[in-house]
Each structure stands twice: as structure tokens, then as C-alpha cells.
Amino acid sequence: MTISQDLFARAQASIPGGVNSPVRAFNGVGGTPLFITKAEGAFTFDADGNRYIDYVGSWGPMIMGHNHPAIKQAVHDAVENGLSYGAPTEAEILMAEKVKELVPSIEKVRMVSSGTEATMSAIRLARGFTGRDKILKFEGCYHGHADSLLVKAGSGALTMGVPNSPGIPEDFAKHTLTVSFNNLDEVKAIFAKYADEIACIIVEPVAGNMNCIPPVPGFLEGLRDVCDEYKSVLIFDEVMTGFRVALGGAQAYYNIKPDLTCLGKVIGGGMPVGAFGGKTEIMDYIAPVGPVYQAGTLSGNPIAMAAGLKSLELLSEPGLHAKLEATSKAICEGFEAGAKKAGIALTTNYAGGMYGFFFTDAEKVTTYKQATECDLERFKRFFHLMLEEGVYLAPSAFEAGFVCAAHNEQEIKDTIAAAERAFAKL
């Protein structure tokens, strides 16, 4: 028995499923999850002493690479003054000012402690601002585990094999309308039917929870136009894409301005941080200046602010995001070439510092339906073959891959060579 196997057995006796977030349990690929003991740069190390080139990156936050010395020092300096105050600090102001600088659509921003809190709060705010109840989301897009958003969600829900979650009252879920991602005609049809009942559209501008699926040309522009026409709030869930697809997020990458933006992952530099922000007229509906209540004991925690601010400062280095996208492109091209050589049908997508690959005959995957129809059994085998090669991919066919600034030429070459050997064994 490996040390990871022993730890997993112990964990299951005290933690539901042995994990504190479902996708970590390896249900999507089978086998025993890796128990990580440390991480450095582009690598993670498990309890059995194995080293892996890491493309999970703590599910997105570690864009500068693991254990970055400058971020670590910023945390150390902040800890010297205390862990949490439950009171305003200058660090919160500096973080808010930095977010506004990098994401111009955000005029005011509220800090929270997770991406789920960010999306949940943004939905409540949109409903309060518009006085409407219904929201529109897309099949396969995951926006955290708030009740109204776990309807035809992607990622963990797909990995579990269920489109929804028990425990959500039907009377509550009925206010969530769902249409196909990348299908503007369905959006227009639902708005024509419900008109002034829809408070907002919430969308991942690049879907990262049915693997990586970018928007088709005109889709995001169309959502902007529909929201303008019906006076609904357009919410970009950039928890995954924020500061990763581009310095200004997917909205900068695709040049579309939402009304509200949800942030998480990268913004915390590895600490638990989320945020939502947008137009002043909407954000001023939040308490204490407005009637929509939102609060959090650890919101704006000084340690988290220090880590996040330093991460955003490092990300502002000229050329860094071009390097990230070049890495994503190289991985995708290498995987496609290796699969073709082995006679295996595979296609890829990428946007900035995130990528995805699909075992399918389709030329491109652009929808949730296509993602669910890919060869999931082949993905499982490939995942374990890559693990044996020392490459740690996301343990689910419905999760995007993440590159980081520490993935250099050697790591890319080693990853592509490992993939070629794995494809040959499939």
C-alpha cells in the first residue's frame, strides 16, 4: 500500500469521501487521489516522494508557480502584524485599487472569501438592483455551489454523474433558466418569453468546467446586446479566467464589458479570496450604503490581501501573459501531434493560460453536449498513464488545464514527450 492509499483510507473515516472538495477524490478517473506534501515552481510532490509536472495549479490560483518567494515573503510580512482584525485595513484599499486598475469595468469592488461567495453575492445584487427573480445560466457552466447555480452545472457535478444536486427546493430552482452555451438563439428565445422577469445572465466567458470551451465569435457580444435591450445585468464569472486569460481577464481578451464581474482563484495568490465588482450604480446597492445585504467575517483578510496583491503585481510584468498563452498553445499542439501519430482522435482548445483536450472525432468542441459525448474511458486511461510519466493533469475530463509562469521550455518538452508515450499505449 502506498502512503497516499493509507492516507486516503484514514481520510475516509473522518472526512466525507475522504476529501474536502469532490473532484479531488478521483471519482472522474478512478484510483487513489494523490496526497500532496509540498509544491515548488511547476512541480508538486506527493506523500510517496513522487514529483509531478503540475497542470492543476491548485485548480487555477498558482499562476506564478507554486511557493513563489515574493508571495511567500508578502505573506510572512503580513503575518508579523497579526492574522485577522475584522476591521478595515489599507491592504483592502490597495487590493481594490489594483483590481480597478487591471479591470476597467470594475468601478467598485467587494472582497469575499471564495468564488462561490462572489457569484452568490453578485446574483443577489443583480436581483436586488433589478427587482427581478429569474436568472439565466448556461448548461455545463459551474458558478460555485450556491443553490440557484447548481442547475445543469459542469465540473464536479458532471464528474459525480449528476446534472443537479439534491437539497435544492424545486420552488427555488424554478427561478434559474438554463440554455446551451454558445447558442445565442436560445438566449434570445428565453428573453422573448420572460422579458422583464430576468435579473441577469451569468456566464463563464471561457467555460472551464466542461473542460475548456471558448466562446464562438459573436456569442459574448450577443449577450451584451440582449442585456442592454432587456435592461438585465450581465455578469461575467471570471473566477477562473480573471487575470489568467489576460491581465484584464476574458473581458479584456474578448473586448466585452460586463456590468458585474466575479473573481477568485488568481486574485488570492493561493489564499482563499473572492471578489465581485462592477458599475458604481449597481455596487452601491450593497450594504451598508444600499439595501442588499452581504457580509463576511474574514472578507478582506490582511494575509489574503497581501498574497493576492503581490500576485497581481507580479502578473503585471510585460509579456507574461503572452508567455502563458504560448505555453497553452504548445501543449495543445504537442498533444494533437502525439495523438495523430498514434492514430487517436483528439482536439484541443485554449485561451490565454488555460487549455483543454477532448478525445473526440469532432473538429472542435464548442458545446456542453459535445463535451459529455467525448471518450471518457480513454481520458481515464490517459490520465493514469500521464501520472505514471510524472505529469499531473486535472483528474476529470470536465476540468480545464492550467499553465503557470514556472512552466518553462524543458517542462513543456517533457510533458509533450510523456503524452506521446501515453498516446502510444492507449
UniProtKB/Swiss-Prot annotation:
<comment type="pathway">
    <text>Porphyrin-containing compound metabolism; protoporphyrin-IX biosynthesis; 5-aminolevulinate from L-glutamyl-tRNA(Glu): step 2/2.</text>
</comment>
<dbReference type="InterPro" id="IPR015424">
    <property type="entry name" value="PyrdxlP-dep_Trfase"/>
</dbReference>
<keyword id="KW-0627">Porphyrin biosynthesis</keyword>
<dbReference type="GO" id="GO:0008483">
    <property type="term" value="F:transaminase activity"/>
</dbReference>
<dbReference type="GO" id="GO:0042286">
    <property type="term" value="F:glutamate-1-semialdehyde 2,1-aminomutase activity"/>
</dbReference>
<dbReference type="InterPro" id="IPR049704">
    <property type="entry name" value="Aminotrans_3_PPA_site"/>
</dbReference>
<protein>
    <recommendedName>
        <fullName>Glutamate-1-semialdehyde 2,1-aminomutase</fullName>
        <ecNumber>5.4.3.8</ecNumber>
    </recommendedName>
</protein>
<keyword id="KW-0963">Cytoplasm</keyword>
<dbReference type="GO" id="GO:0005737">
    <property type="term" value="C:cytoplasm"/>
</dbReference>
<feature type="modified residue" description="N6-(pyridoxal phosphate)lysine">
    <location>
        <position position="265"/>
    </location>
</feature>
<dbReference type="GO" id="GO:0030170">
    <property type="term" value="F:pyridoxal phosphate binding"/>
</dbReference>
<keyword id="KW-0663">Pyridoxal phosphate</keyword>
<dbReference type="InterPro" id="IPR015422">
    <property type="entry name" value="PyrdxlP-dep_Trfase_small"/>
</dbReference>
<dbReference type="InterPro" id="IPR004639">
    <property type="entry name" value="4pyrrol_synth_GluAld_NH2Trfase"/>
</dbReference>
<dbReference type="InterPro" id="IPR015421">
    <property type="entry name" value="PyrdxlP-dep_Trfase_major"/>
</dbReference>
<dbReference type="Pfam" id="PF00202">
    <property type="entry name" value="Aminotran_3"/>
</dbReference>
<keyword id="KW-0413">Isomerase</keyword>
<comment type="similarity">
    <text>Belongs to the class-III pyridoxal-phosphate-dependent aminotransferase family. HemL subfamily.</text>
</comment>
<dbReference type="GO" id="GO:0006782">
    <property type="term" value="P:protoporphyrinogen IX biosynthetic process"/>
</dbReference>
<dbReference type="InterPro" id="IPR005814">
    <property type="entry name" value="Aminotrans_3"/>
</dbReference>
<comment type="subunit">
    <text>Homodimer.</text>
</comment>
